């Protein structure tokens, strides 16, 4: 299983994300995920830059790692034709190192233009048609599309990459997993769910990528790490479909008052012990994932990269960390 780094656009500004991307490459991570949000989940996280601008900067700051959006919603806030152009441009800049991760989105980000937030079945239907629009435009030449949800009239993407990026579909339930198997080049999810992986593979056939995301918090003590997780990411422990339907960071903050500190960090490896990190990672390997992308919660980025370069990545990735690279690169932004 290959190990990558998960860049959090909700928790860090664009300049800091570029800095983290450089450190991740130097530490020996195999790839990058980057989240795409209009809003953070809560005000404490405090950021949400425009991901496509950040991707352009990362393309120039790195030279080896694949970069995947994790994930972009191409259905409500941004028309899939615009996503098709943005992804094509990113693929040109990254020269074969870009993958487009797509999902059905959350009201938190997609409600901002006043559009009605659709029911889950409609959202999946829109996602399927959005992928059709994107792939149609990636064929090159003048294209039109007249579907149930989207219209495209005489549109052409002039800058297409030599190698079209794969499209990964995010899934958290049986319906979205089946959709990913049917229309995606790969599948991405969070949590070491072996049943979901098996369901995807049984429907998709062989050869399609399965990638996962995981949060971690490296700190001087386990207690400090758990406090950091609770302060920044209590929303991760919210049950059911709340993450898809709550419309603002304030609503997430209100709902998160029902989450205890223990619940918030229950599934997050916390503290300085590499064995705790390895145990959490191994669960994904045992579940059958091909790739795992790990997000460090909080501002202890240098200790995280040091620990992973020296203790974690050598057990999984083929790449070796460079020496002397974990020096601060200026103030975070």
What would you call each of these model-derived segments?
Residues 1-333:
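Active-site-adjacent structural elements that line small-molecule/cofactor binding pockets in enzymes
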């Amino acid at each position: 299983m290959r190990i990558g780094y998960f860049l959090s656009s909700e928790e860090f500004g664009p300049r800091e994300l570029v800095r983290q991307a450089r450190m991740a490459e130097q530490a020996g991570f195999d790839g990058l995920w980057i989240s795409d949000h209009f809003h953070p989940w809560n005000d404490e996280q405090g950021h949400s830059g425009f991901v496509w601008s950040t991707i352009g900067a990362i393309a120039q700051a790195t030279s080896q790692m694949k970069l995947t959006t994790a994930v972009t919603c191409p259905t409500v806030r941004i028309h899939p034709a615009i996503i098709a152009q943005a992804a094509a441009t990113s693929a040109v800049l990254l020269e074969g190192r870009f993958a487009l991760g797509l999902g059905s989105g959350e009201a938190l980000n997609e409600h901002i233009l006043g559009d009605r937030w659709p029911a889950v079945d409609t959202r999946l239907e829109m996602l399927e048609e959005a992928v059709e629009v994107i792939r149609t435009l990636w064929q090159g030449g003048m294209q039109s599309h007249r579907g149930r949800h989207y219209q495209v009239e005489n549109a052409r993407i002039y800058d297409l990459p030599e190698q079209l990026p794969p499209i990964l579909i995010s899934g958290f339930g049986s319906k979205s997993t089946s959709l990913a198997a049917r229309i995606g080049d790969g599948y991405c999810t969070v949590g070491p769910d072996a049943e979901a992986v098996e369901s995807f593979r049984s429907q998709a056939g062989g050869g399609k990528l399965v990638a996962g995301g995981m949060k971690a918090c490296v700190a001087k003590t386990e207690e400090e790490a758990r406090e950091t997780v609770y302060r920044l990411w209590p929303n991760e422990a919210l049950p059911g479909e709340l993450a898809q339907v709550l419309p603002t960071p304030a609503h997430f903050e209100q709902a998160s008052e029902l989450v205890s500190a223990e619940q918030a960090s229950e599934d997050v490896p916390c503290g300085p012990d590499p064995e705790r990190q390895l145990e959490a990672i191994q669960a994904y390997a045992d579940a059958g994932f091909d790739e795992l992308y790990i997000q460090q919660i909080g501002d202890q980025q240098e200790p995280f990269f040091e620990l992973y370069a020296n203790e974690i990545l050598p057990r999984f990735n083929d790449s070796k960390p460079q020496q002397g690279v974990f020096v601060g690169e200026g103030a975070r932004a």
